[in-house]
Design a protein with these regions (language model features):
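Active-site-proximal alpha/beta segments of enzymes that process anionic O-linked groups
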Residues: 1-92, 163, 191-192, 197-205, ...
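Soluble non-cytosolic domains of exported or imported proteins
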Residues: 23-30, 99, 103-110, 186-193
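A long, amphipathic alpha-helix that forms part
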Residues: 34-37, 75-131
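Membrane-interface soluble catalytic domains
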Residues: 38, 118-128, 139-141, 145, ...
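Short beta-strand segments
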Residues: 47-54, 106-109, 130-135, 168
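Feature marks short, surface-exposed loop/turn motifs that line or immediately flank catalytic pockets
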Residues: 54-57, 137-141
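Short Pro/Gly-enriched coil loops immediately N-terminal to beta-strands
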Residues: 157-163
Length: 264
C-alpha cells in the first residue's frame, strides 16, 4: 500500500523508494532516521519525503521499555506489529482509560519524535539542509474528561484535532529566506496548505506565479484563517467542512519535569 493515494505511475518518478516492512513497527522511525542521516551526509542535492510511524494509535507498543517515562500506561504486548489501527478490546474510553492512553502517547512521542530528532541532529550533516516537520492531524486526548473512543477523525471533532506542529529547521551554511521575518505574524496562523508553495519557492519558482496558483508560502504573511477540514473530501468525494481553531479554548498538558520530558 502507498501513502496518501500515491499510485504506481507516480511511484516510478521517485529515484529511490524505501520501505521498512521487515523492521519492527517500534523501530521503523529509527530506521527512517538512519536513512535520513545517510542521505544528509552524502553531500548530494535531494528532495526527501518521509512518512513516519509517529504516534498513531494503537500506542501501546510503539516505544521501548527504556522510554516508559510516563506511568501508569496501557498494557503492553498486544499491538507490537500494528502500525496504524487496532481493536479497542479492553479500552472503554472512560476517564481512567484515557489517563493510561495519554501516558502511552507521551512515551511514544518521546521515542518516535524526541529520539528521532536526537539522532538526526546528532549524526546528520544539516549544514546545507532544510527540514520541514509536521503531522497529518492532531489528537483528541480527552483531557477535558470527555468519554469516547476516538482520538481523531470523528464527525464532530474537538479543536485540538486540527492542531499540528509546523517546524522549519535550516542549516547554518544554507542561505534561503529569512524565516524569522514572518515568524511572529505566521505563528499559529499557518497550515499544511502553505508547505507546498514553500517547497516551490525553495526550488526557485517565481513567488507571484506560485501564489496565483498554489497560495502563499511561509516566507510571506500567510493570512491563514486557522481552520481545518474535518471531512475526507480528498478520499471520499465529500464537500469539505471547515472548523476554526480558537487557541483560547485549547487544552494543553501540564509541564512535565525536565528529567521525564527527556525520557530519563
Amino acid at each position: 500500500n502507498l501513502q496518501n493515494l500515491m499510485n504506481d505511475a507516480e511511484k516510478k518518478d521517485i529515484d529511490e523508494f524505501v520501505q521498512f516492512d521487515r523492521t519492527s513497527v517500534r523501530d521503523r522511525d529509527m530506521a527512517a532516521a538512519a536513512k535520513l542521516i545517510e542521505l544528509l551526509n552524502d553531500d548530494k542535492p535531494e528532495l526527501i519525503l518521509i512518512n513516519k510511524v509517529g504516534a498513531h494509535f494503537p500506542v501501546h507498543d510503539k516505544y521501548p521499555d527504556a522510554f516508559m517515562a510516563y506511568r501508569p500506561t496501557l498494557p503492553r504486548g498486544q499491538f507490537t506489529e500494528v502500525a496504524d489501527t487496532g481493536e479497542r478490546n479492553g479500552f472503554n474510553g472512560q476517564v481512567d482509560d484515557w489517563v493510561l492512553y495519554r501516558n502511552a502517547y507521551k512515551n511514544t512521542v518521546l521515542w518516535n519524535v524526541g529520539e528521532f530528532f536526537a539522532r538526526v541532529l546528532a549524526k546528520g550533516n544539516l549544514n546545507n539542509a532544510l527540514l520541514i516537520y509536521t503531522s497529518d492531524h492532531g489528537q483528541d486526548l480527552h483531557e477535558r474528561g470527555n468519554p469516547g473512543l476516538n482520538t481523531h477523525c470523528g464527525g464532530d471533532p474537538v479543536e485540538e484535532e486540527g492542531l499540528v506542529p509546523l517546524v522549519v529547521i535550516q542549516g547554518r551554511d544554507l542561505k534561503t529566506f529569512d524565516w524569522s521575518a514572518q515568524l511572529a505574524a505566521n505563528k499559529d496562523r499557518s497550515s499544511h496548505y502553505n508547505i507546498f508553495p514553500t517547497l516551490l519557492q525553495l526550488m526557485g519558482y517565481d513567488l507571484a506565479g506560485i501564489e496565483s496558483v498554489y497560495g502563499k508560502p511561509l516566507t510571506v504573511p500567510t493570512g491563514d484563517e486557522f481552520t481545518f477540514n474535518y471531512r475526507f473530501n480528498a478520499r471520499l468525494g465529500a464537500k469539505p467542512e471547515w472548523k476554526h481553531i480558537d487557541l483560547g479554548s485549547i487544552v494543553t498538558p501540564t509541564q512535565a519535569p525536565a528529567s521525564v520530558a527527556a525520557g530519563q
